Amino acid sequence: MAVLAPLIALVYSVPRLSRWLARPYCLLSALLSIAFLLVRKLPPICNGLPTQREDGNPCDFDWREVEILMFLSAIVMMKNRRSITVEQHVGNIFMFSKVANAILFFRLDIRMGLLYLTLCIVFLMTCKPPLYMGPEYIKYFNDKTIDEELERDKRVTWIVEFFANWSNDCQSFAPIYADLSLKYNCSGLNFGKVDVGRYTDVSTRYKVSTSPLTKQLPTLILFQGGKEVMRRPQIDKKGRAVSWTFSEENVIREFNLNELYQRAKKLSKGGDMSEEKPGNPTPTAVPDGENKKDK
């Protein structure tokens, strides 16, 4: 079962993964990830390259290059143990493959290493990771609307994600959060998002650090009666996030979503709150002047 479950998940994710991989960002990232393999293996490119092989074959890996590639495989396997989505697995492979490529190119020739490093920098500056653009029941806030919405109707329970576009963890969590909003959104239980990378005063006001060192992104906060009730991840005394996995199961369990949903449904039936049926996606509500691509 330990092997079967990931295989089933991979097969289930093939259509979505193929669309994700077909985007320019992923294609270019894959090309950079196999750059050294192409240079070392494809003649006439490999002809004349320096090598430490005893047979002097420049178009095959030497023992040190094999060691580096094996070490890369071990690192990827260790990092992927905490990955939730297939996109996270592929993203880890891309990232560590580029690091290994840079080491291999610098070892081969410092000029080739500098050229590869320049290409990676240009890629990072010009290509942005694909954002999740699927169906969701999520309202996007700005620095003004978040406080107004939380105070507008205190009977409504809000779960708000504080995110930043540059965070890979936030991008990986986006489809999971969208699925949760489709399953649990109703008139008494709403889902929201705010870009603290864009609205820095919001991050200060709600004490969500945007520093990569604190690992506080993404942060989920539960609001009831306009007040914060709980958040994940929790913060230790040094201001760093306590390790927490943003999986669908963890969010449902930690935030008691099933109980919150049933309570919100009873509230909507007993009061004058309009009923919304989760599972049927509607256009995402965003503040004036913003759209999901801005996120």
From Swiss-Prot:
GO terms for molecular function: disulfide oxidoreductase activity; identical protein binding. It is found in: Endoplasmic reticulum membrane; Mitochondrion membrane. Its main location: endoplasmic reticulum. The chain crosses the membrane at residues 103-125. One of its GO terms (biological process) is brain development. Gene3D superfamilies: Glutaredoxin (3.40.30.10). GO terms for cellular component: endoplasmic reticulum membrane; mitochondria-associated endoplasmic reticulum membrane contact site; mitochondrial membrane; mitochondrion. Keywords: Disulfide bond, Endoplasmic reticulum, Membrane, Mitochondrion, Phosphoprotein, Signal, Transmembrane, Transmembrane helix. SUPFAM superfamilies: Thioredoxin-like. The modification Phosphoserine is found at residues 211, 243. Residues 266-295 are annotated as: Disordered. A motif (Di-lysine motif) lies at residues 292-295. The thioredoxin domain lacks the 2 redox-active cysteines, suggesting that it lacks thioredoxin activity. This is Thioredoxin-related transmembrane protein 2. It comes from Rattus norvegicus (Rat). The gene is Tmx2.
